[in-house]
């Protein structure tokens, strides 16, 4: 079947599933008509393949799948673009049941395609932009935890060192022991810094535990 010149670009849904020779755009109108074996019309409906920024209308696959149970019936499809009309007639048989499964599977694949335009058909899946924002939030949380567990211990190290200098007790053996104990504790358990650092500051500034400054007269 030769593809008319206005219908050269093929949509992946049609290319992999049904008619690889035809394509659709926002200007295409799809007409379907299915008849039973006795030629009584099962339905005669007209569908528009709608292209918008955030949704795709997949009524074509839905229509084709709904006609599969008429295994012996006839299905006619009609593409209409302006004054150009293309008719397709086919006869369903038992093998077309496999085609129905392929259509439904392809429809799910399109809905789950993260690289395609945002799809919103009956709100079956969330908009992919929300997933991107969620992943960005997770990355920010991981950066925050990384900074917390690796940067805070060293900040506390310099704060404690500065506090020892100010208290003029750098050479006091008890302060050195406490200082090293707290420092290595902070490296292993950063959350302890918020509890032990104020206590250690009070310990250094206490008059009962501080010695006279070696620099005082």
Swiss-Prot record:
Its main location: mitochondrion. Signal peptide: none annotated. Keywords: Membrane, Mitochondrion, Transit peptide, Transmembrane, Transmembrane helix. GO terms for cellular component: mitochondrial membrane; mitochondrion. It is found in: Mitochondrion membrane. The chain crosses the membrane at residues 151-171, 177-197. It is a multi-pass membrane protein. This is Uncharacterized protein C17A2.11, mitochondrial. It comes from Schizosaccharomyces pombe (strain 972 / ATCC 24843) (Fission yeast).
């Amino acid at each position: 079947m030769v593809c008319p010149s206005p219908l050269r670009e093929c949509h992946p849904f049609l290319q992999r599933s049904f008619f690889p020779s035809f394509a659709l755009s926002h200007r295409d109108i799809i007409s379907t008509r299915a008849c039973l074996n006795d030629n009584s019309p099962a339905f005669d409906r007209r569908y528009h393949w709608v292209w918008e920024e955030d949704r795709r209308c997949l009524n074509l696959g839905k229509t084709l799948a709904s006609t599969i149970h008429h295994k012996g019936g006839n299905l006619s499809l009609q593409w209409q673009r302006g004054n150009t009309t293309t008719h397709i007639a086919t006869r369903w048989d038992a093998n077309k049941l496999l085609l129905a499964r392929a259509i439904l599977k392809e429809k799910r694949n399109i809905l789950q395609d993260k690289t395609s335009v945002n799809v919103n058909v009956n709100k079956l899946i969330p908009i992919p932009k929300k997933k991107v924002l969620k992943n960005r939030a997770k990355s920010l949380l991981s950066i925050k935890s990384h900074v917390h567990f690796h940067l805070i211990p060293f900040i506390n190290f310099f704060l404690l060192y500065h506090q020892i200098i100010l208290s003029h007790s750098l050479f006091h053996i008890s302060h050195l022991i406490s200082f090293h104990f707290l420092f290595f504790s902070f490296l292993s358990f950063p959350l302890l810094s918020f509890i032990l650092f104020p206590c250690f500051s009070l310990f250094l500034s206490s008059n009962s535990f501080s010695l006279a400054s070696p620099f005082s007269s």
